[in-house]
Amino acid sequence: MKFLTLNTHSWMEEDAEGKFQTLKEQILKAKYDIICFQEVNQEIETSVVDTDAYYHALPSATPIHQDHFVRLLVEKLAEEGLQYHWTWAYNHIGYDHLNEGVAVLSRQPLTASEILVSDVDDPTDYHTRRVAVAETTVDGREVAVASVHLSWWDKGFQEEWARIE
């Protein structure tokens, strides 16, 4: 099984477009079975777009926007012949202008769910944390994977981790 996890800090880094291209090229080269991303962002004010059947929406999902990091990445990968199913768990507003969350991508169809692990469930509170869970198959074996971005050790991590267990 080829697995990648990465805190993308999407659209917040210097040379974000260059890093996006580097990531796309690495995925095309490695052809990961499963990918988990954290800090997957989209601007709050950009236009909402339609999604295709490869996107598996969760109950907490805010609409997907034109600049959604994973949507764009999956679209570019598909143009190169590499298709991924994906889901995104929306957590909270980041830096006053971003919808931020965690994502799971799978080369095989997936069943998506989420777990609220924080004490709060308020998108305006950066303490809000959800885990994106995907059940899928890899090499004929059923697997469950989770994309997790928990609080700092002394700011809620232990309680959040206990809710996952």
Task: Show which residues each predicted segment covers.
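Conserved residues at the C-terminal ends of beta-strands
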Residues: Q38, E43, S106, L116, ...
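Beta-strand-turn-beta hairpins that frame and shape the catalytic cleft
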Residues: M1-L4, H97-V102, S106-A112, Y126-S147
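Short, flexible loop segments at the rims of nucleotide/cofactor-binding pockets, characterized by
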Residues: S10-D15, D122-T124, D154-F157
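Short secondary-structure junctions
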Residues: L82-T87, P109-I115
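N-terminal, active-site-proximal structural segment of metallo-dependent hydrolase catalytic domains
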Residues: M1-L98, R141, E160-R163
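Short, P/G- and charge-enriched loop/turn segments at secondary-structure junctions
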Residues: A89-I93, S118-P123
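Active-site beta-loop-alpha substructure in enzyme catalytic cores
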Residues: G140-E165
